[in-house]
Amino acid sequence: VKKINFLLSELFQYAHSEGDIAKNPMRNVKMPKKTLFKPEREIIALESEEVRALEQVAVMKRKNGLPLITHANLIVFLVHTGLRCGELQALKWSDIDFCSKTVTVNKNLSMVCDRDRNGERKNHKKAKIKGTKTTSGNRIVPLNTKAIAALKNLHTIYRKKGICSPNVVASLNGNMLSNDQLQRVLHRVLKYAEISKPFTLHQLRHTFATQTLNAGVPITVVSKWLGHANVSVTYNTYIHVLESVETTAVTLLEAI
């Protein structure tokens, strides 16, 4: 719109300077204000029965009694908290309060360019834990019964396998799992749950938001749990869910 406005203004200004027109009609044209609404994009989320299937896979065991998928409980934890992948990777066991049933989110793992002694960028990136990008990213998220169970199950598995790490996300040697490794865990869980839809870790966050909104949790509360900068971000992202909730509400109104 800005480009078209500029080109037309220049065109009419030239015509005015040449005497072809009395005045530039674009002179008093004002640009429209930016709208808060973004073009609607498709949000993929798991259905309730698919979430139940993930939970069942997380507790599956091999014949030797060990879990079928070591880190499957991380997937269950994500779908019940809505944390970003980087926030999960930066999470310490000390961030979990089992008494108050909350998790404190104040860190984020991101991939940054590594540099040599001269300050030049190297071809590879390294993982670095930083504070959350925004103030709203620092938050306390409540843990439901299933999120608590997933963490306790994971801690038990770590103990049985001799994994000793302050990190909630840890490999067999105690190192942090990468995004790709977590994505592979998700793919394995989806396979055993017989869910064929293409799915990413971030869509577990969408699933959490969708299910909480459908359950009737106020959007302001959901926005706070997700760590969004403001409630309009939540509204614009999940407007389709809110429209569905409104439709259900209208149906209930008819029953009064």
Locate each region found by the language model:
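C-terminal flanking helix
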Residues: S9-F12, H16, L242, E246
